[in-house]
Curated annotation (Swiss-Prot):
Coiled coil: none annotated. GO terms for molecular function: N-acetylmuramoyl-L-alanine amidase activity. It is found in: Secreted. The lineage of its organism: Bacteria, Pseudomonadati, Pseudomonadota, Gammaproteobacteria, Lysobacterales. Monomer. Disulfide bonds: none annotated. This is N-acetylmuramoyl-L-alanine amidase L2. It comes from the Bacteria. Has bacteriolytic activity. Inhibited by phenylmethanesulfonyl fluoride (PMSF) and EDTA. It catalyses: Hydrolyzes the link between N-acetylmuramoyl residues and L-amino acid residues in certain cell-wall glycopeptides. One of its GO terms (cellular component) is extracellular region. Its main location: secreted.
Amino acid sequence: XNVVFLNXPXPQW
């Protein structure tokens, strides 16, 4: 799956 980590300028997959 794709887990969205909002720990950057944009969502990282």
